[in-house]
Amino acid sequence: MRNRLARLIVTLSLLLCSAVTAQAQFNLLPEIRGGISARGVDGGGNLFDPNRISDANVELLFAVPDINKWSIIGELRPHLGATVSFSGQDSYAYTGLSWTIQAPVLPVFVEAQAGGVARSSLLNGNQTDPARNFGCGIGARVAASAGVNLPLGASIIATVEHLPDFGTCGTPQRANTNVGVRLGFRF
């Protein structure tokens, strides 16, 4: 587990370093976000219990020239992220498209995300483990966020994400709903 975590951190660091270099030349990486989240909030219990906070998240949002021609309002951006669990649950990487809508006058925004997710159970599960099934190890991810823009290009963001498995993990609907808070930095 620690070895995989170390590899994930090194990989994300290398991506971050190369992306910052690319950003300086092409402005392909206009925003980086990081934060913490509580997993499985749809299972009941106290949402504000600090023991539920068991994940760390990093997300990179990219700028693609001319992609916003498809959006009447807001900003469309591809994203790439990873969530690491410190409680022995699945970690996962995800990618997809973010649609951010800024309020006209106020420094607030809302965002919707949709895409795919690859869970660590895909790599560390037994060959016959249902966690390796398509839709379980690799599946869908949707998220919704609300944020406040802070000075100097920073923002604070509250996020709810849902990772459905459509019953492919061998158990009826092992879907996961997580809530978190992140700090974003625009360049």
Identify what each model region corresponds to.
Residues 44-52, 82-93, 104-106, 168-174:
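Solvent-exposed loop/turn segments connecting transmembrane beta-strands
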Residues 1-27:
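Cleavable N-terminal export/targeting peptides
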Residues 56-58, 175-187:
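Outer-membrane beta-barrel "beta-signal"
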Residues 39-40, 111-143, 147:
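Outer-membrane beta-barrel translocator/channel fold
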Residues 32-44, 74-86, 158-164:
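Transmembrane beta-strand segments that form the barrel wall of outer-membrane beta-barrel proteins
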Residues 23-29, 64-76, 102-110, 153:
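Short loop/turn motifs that connect adjacent beta-strands in outer-membrane beta-barrel proteins
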Residues 25-62:
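Outer-membrane beta-barrel initiation region
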Residues 60-64, 84, 99-103, 148-150, ...:
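Residue-level signature of outer-membrane beta-barrel architecture
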